[in-house]
């Protein structure tokens, strides 16, 4: 079976494509199909933006499509400074990975150098008739103003996010770290959601 993943983010593709391939699901990408549309993400939360992406790419290709979006919430920030659905878009400008690290390091520094944050994820599978939704979150982690040197292309904040349970940057987590902190690593549940809804 083939499914389109409506993202250009190489880290998201890598994170899920290998595990889905093990379940005999081939993940096609926007790049694979040479699609050059960019739906406007006007949703109020991760599920709404995931639906917008999934429907737009399904309408373009007629291939069952996965849309995914992330929201970032930072406990110590006032509402007007919350990234929410606009993690990459700051003041109307889309930031690249380096721009995100610079912006968020400065923001964290402004509020004391260490902030408590949480990712909330939304995934939608759309097949032209109906949509299936799944939402999950990672437990709280810390954003710090001193990023490590290593980078995870497509997930730049992994270089400045620390898992409190093991005091490691996300970019340095091993599979063993993730398995020990199972609450923080829910990808198997996401894979089950995809497999069960195709």
Q: Which residues make up each language-model segment?
A:
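Anionic-ligand binding patches
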Residues: 2-4, 11-18, 23-198
């Amino acid at each position: 079976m083939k499914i389109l993943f409506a993202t250009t983010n190489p880290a998201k593709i890598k994170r899920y494509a290998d595990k889905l391939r093990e379940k005999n699901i081939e993940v096609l990408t926007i790049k694979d199909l040479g699609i050059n549309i960019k739906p406007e993400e006007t949703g109020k939360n991760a599920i709404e933006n995931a639906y917008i992406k999934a429907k737009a790419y399904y309408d373009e290709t007629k291939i069952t499509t996965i849309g995914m979006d992330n929201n970032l919430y930072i406990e110590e920030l006032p509402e007007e400074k919350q990234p929410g659905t606009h993690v990459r878009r700051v003041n109307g400008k889309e930031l690249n990975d380096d721009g995100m690290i610079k912006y968020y390091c400065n923001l964290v520094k402004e509020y004391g150098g260490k902030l408590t944050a949480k990712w909330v994820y939304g995934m939608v599978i759309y097949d032209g008739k109906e949509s299936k939704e799944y939402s999950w979150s990672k437990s709280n982690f810390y954003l710090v103003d001193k990023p490590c040197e290593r980078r995870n292309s497509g997930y730049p904040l992994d270089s400045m996010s620390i898992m409190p349970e093991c005091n490691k940057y996300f970019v340095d987590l091993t599979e063993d770290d993730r398995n020990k902190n199972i609450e923080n690593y829910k990808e198997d549940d996401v894979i089950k959601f995809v497999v069960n809804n195709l």
